[in-house]
Amino acid sequence: MALIRDAARVCKSKNAGPFELTVDVVFDDAETFQRVKATGVLCPELFARLYNVPAEHVLFTPYDAAFAFKATFPRLVPSGDFGDTDVYGCQQHAPLLDVDLPI
């Protein structure tokens, strides 16, 4: 088992406009990426659970050529709106860091 924080080269988030967030998880090499992909842990349902959005609202794409996964989903509060605690969306990857990968 490995935590995403230890297995991934990059785990980052940012706004995808004022109403959506995008999260990227990038691995060092094809072997690690393929092992993670084969587990099925990184999937729309994981992002739905971690970010409290319906799975059908999560756009999830593995990018084999970049050894990366990308997920885009609605923000719970629009960027800059009352109650927003991360106007740039750059701290929203934190819940992923402690996800266990059975690799």
Residue ranges and their predicted role:
Residues M1-I103:
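Long, contiguous binding/interaction regions
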